[in-house]
């Protein structure tokens, strides 16, 4: 039985006219090859004037979603840069004053880096533009934006190889017009663990408030924010003094749980058990990660005899410290019915402060971690994750400071590498560059990476400029640092107007008991409420360094989330619409009245490839696309019609149609009067090459149909 679909799709061409070829580039993905050759369709490789290159097609160690890449082994260079190059043979139209962004993936072998020049040039004299890119040993996407000075119908993109003795790899090329954001769901990265914050401080202040006000604050923090992570103190005085002299026999009755209990008559009470259980009962989706963090071991275990002012663990007290942490886990479960899922034995060991702290070196911390990991297994807590080191900084030139430097040192020991389940950091340095995030990712050796505490400490502001502190760390951290989770320092705290110092918490109240919601609260909703645990980051490409972009898809492929933050105002921004999108929701937070507001006035045509919008300065935008998988994956026939490339148009002697799918097709051509001038069936292929010399100079339309058994 044959099923067939008939689709009318009209193109017009007028012969003996200059070509006006439109983007996108033909075979930009470098997937289609010429039959019987080792060359990509619409691409050519040159070696002239002494240049010598071994050109081939690579099929291994590619980026996700790719099956082929251009491989160029450079033996020697020519006398000029253009003598050794790969160029697109698809000549396309450009317009004066328009911006065109070139994106491509590349890597090199044979050296740790090499230079590749990206070139834009047409037949117009003086049209040459080139930009050098430093390519390293790992696949990476590069981009450059060209502004064209002259109109042309014959613009060409080429890649010049500028170093010999290395092998270049090139793949997934793209040229986009204007301000375009592209998505690639086939390229996936890390899986999200979640979003949250801490209650390490201020719980006693919250529980001093009237019950109705406290309930409002907790509802805002734990219900309206759809977080799934919470972090709290392991207090140093839980075991002070020593329970006994045997670190392997815990005396639970000697532990002091005052800080975790709810006793308003005791100044040391912190209501931790009640605060945690209230959070759990309010949560819509539940908490996947419940994290105990210890600033300092009990004073009697430390070199300075105090839980404050740094110091470190006395050598040989690792067993006692592990017993202390096991006692905490056991008591939280038995007393408060709370099963802690992750534990961290240090907080900012690289930061010297006067409050609760412990300045352990990487070597000292390594001993603690190995001992703790073994003890967790021995005591039946192997399911509890070990988090470390939670340094104050992501990266630093000082080798004794930062999470990156700690991890680089600690992971030299395979026992520490095995002991640590999650690499955790705080990003309190003034700024974190993309390279510093990448350094942390490399050092972490593919372990999950969490920001477990972050806040714009000391900022008196609650506007979008303050919120941008977190936006930049979240987007850059996930995009470049491999982050899988991000947590604020505190869920709630009182705002100190008198001293002009704001809290860095998510939910605030002032001295008059008025609740304040800073812009960072609404910005965090763009992530915590829209991007869930188990979602995957997907590849996204932008056009402007002032525009932060990140994208995710749900585990069942039913949603695609795109988050954007614009520092300056941008007009006519084009966002690629994912295949199979059947609806889109648009949320905005800005310095205006938009607070995670759902925009209902947008009119987007989801049948188009892109949707256009304007972005105001200092505004956060999130787009939630609902995907019908039957349209994006099963209905390939519909996609086939939307992915056709016609080249050249107008045509003189030959016309080529490239399709997404290889199918048997029947092509019918009509003249301007609607009379049939050609009807022909073509064998299964993703390309039709039509000799047009038999046609008179005129405009024509055509239709085609395909079928499958």
Residue ranges with predicted function:
Residues 20-180, 555-557, 568:
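Extracellular and organelle-lumenal recognition/adhesion modules and their flexible linkers in secreted
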Residues 181-341, 361-366, 370, 374:
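N-terminal catalytic cores of secreted or lumenal carbohydrate-active enzymes
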Residues 267-269, 418-459:
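Glycoside hydrolase catalytic-domain groove-lining segments
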Residues 272, 300-413, 431-438, 442:
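Active-site cleft segment of glycoside hydrolase catalytic domains centered on the general acid/base Glu
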Residues 448-525, 538-543:
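Aromatic/acidic polysaccharide-binding cleft in carbohydrate-active enzymes
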Residues 543-582, 618:
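Carbohydrate-binding surface patches
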Residues 602-630:
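C-terminal beta-strand-rich structural cap/linker in extracellular carbohydrate-active enzymes
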Residues 636-709:
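C-terminal outer-membrane/trafficking sorting elements
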């Amino acid at each position: 039985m044959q099923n067939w679909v008939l689709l009318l799709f009209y193109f017009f061409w007028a012969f003996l006219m200059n070509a006006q070829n439109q983007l996108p580039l033909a075979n930009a993905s470098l997937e289609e090859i010429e039959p019987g050759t080792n060359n990509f369709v619409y691409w050519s490789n040159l070696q002239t004037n002494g240049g010598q290159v071994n050109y081939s097609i690579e099929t291994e160690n590619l980026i996700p979603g790719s099956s082929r890449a251009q491989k160029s082994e450079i033996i020697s260079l020519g006398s000029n840069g253009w003598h050794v190059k790969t160029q697109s043979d698809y000549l396309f139209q450009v317009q004066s004053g328009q911006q065109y962004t070139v994106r491509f993936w590349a890597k090199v072998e044979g050296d740790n880096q090499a230079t590749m020049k990206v070139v834009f040039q047409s037949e117009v004299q003086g049209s040459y533009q080139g930009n050098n890119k430093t390519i390293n040993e790992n696949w990476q996407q590069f981009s450059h934006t060209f502004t064209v000075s002259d109109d042309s119908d014959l613009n060409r993109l080429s890649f010049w190889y500028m170093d010999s003795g290395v092998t270049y790899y090139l793949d997934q090329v793209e040229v986009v017009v204007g301000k375009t954001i592209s998505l690639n769901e086939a390229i996936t990265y890390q899986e999200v663990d979640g979003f949250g914050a801490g209650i390490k401080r201020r719980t006693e202040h919250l529980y001093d408030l009237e019950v109705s006000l406290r309930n409002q604050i907790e509802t805002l923090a734990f219900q309206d924010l759809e977080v799934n992570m919470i972090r709290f103190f392991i207090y140093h005085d839980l075991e002070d003094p020593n329970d006994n002299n045997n670190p392997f026999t815990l005396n639970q009755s000697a532990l002091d749980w005052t800080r975790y209990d709810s006793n308003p008559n005791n100044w040391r009470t912190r209501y931790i058990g009640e605060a945690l259980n209230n959070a759990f009962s309010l949560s819509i989706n539940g908490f996947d990660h419940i994290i105990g963090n210890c600033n300092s071991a009990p004073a009697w275990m430390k070199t300075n005899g105090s839980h404050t002012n740094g110091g470190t663990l006395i050598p040989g007290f690792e067993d006692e410290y592990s017993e202390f942490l096991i006692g905490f886990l056991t008591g939280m479960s038995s007393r408060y019915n709370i099963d802690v899922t992750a534990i961290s034995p240090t907080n900012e060991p690289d930061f010297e402060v006067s409050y609760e702290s412990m300045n352990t070196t990487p070597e000292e911390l390594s001993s603690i971690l190995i001992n703790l990991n073994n003890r967790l297994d021995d005591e039946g807590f192997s399911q509890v994750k070990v988090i470390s080191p939670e340094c104050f900084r992501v990266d630093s030139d000082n080798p004794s400071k930062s999470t990156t430097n700690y991890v680089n040192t600690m992971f030299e020991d395979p026992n520490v590498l095995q002991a640590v389940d999650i690499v955790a950091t705080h990003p309190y340095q003034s700024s974190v560059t993309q390279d510093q995030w990448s350094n942390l990712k490399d050092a972490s050796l593919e372990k999950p990476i969490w920001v477990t505490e972050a806040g714009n400490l000391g900022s008196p502001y609650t506007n979008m400029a303050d919120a941008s502190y977190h936006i930049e760390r979240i987007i850059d951290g996930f995009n470049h640092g491999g982050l899988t989770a991000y947590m604020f320092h505190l869920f709630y705290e009182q705002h100190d107007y008198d001293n002009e110092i704001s809290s860095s918490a998510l939910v605030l109240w002032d001295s008059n008991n008025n609740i304040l919601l800073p812009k960072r609260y609404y910005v965090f909703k763009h992530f915590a409420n829209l991007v869930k645990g188990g979602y995957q980051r997907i590849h996204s490409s932008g056009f402007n360094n002032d525009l932060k972009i990140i994208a995710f898809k749900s585990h069942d492929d039913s949603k695609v989330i795109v988050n954007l933050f614009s520092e300056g105002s941008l007009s006519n921004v084009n966002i690629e619409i994912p295949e199979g999108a059947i609806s889109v929701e648009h949320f905005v937070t800005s310095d205006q009245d938009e607070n995670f507001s759902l925009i209902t006035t947008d009119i987007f045509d989801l049948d188009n490839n892109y949707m256009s919008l304007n972005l105001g300065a200092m505004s956060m935008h999130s787009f939630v696309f609902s995907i019908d998988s039957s349209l994006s994956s099963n209905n390939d026939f519909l996609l086939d019609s939307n992915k056709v490339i016609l080249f050249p148009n107008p045509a003189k002697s030959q016309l080529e149609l490239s399709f997404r799918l290889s199918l048997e097709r029947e092509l019918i051509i009509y003249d301007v009067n609607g009379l049939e001038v050609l009807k022909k069936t073509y064998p299964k292929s993703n390309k039709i090459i039509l000799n047009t010399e038999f046609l008179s100079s005129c405009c024509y339309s055509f239709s085609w149909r395909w079928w499958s058994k």
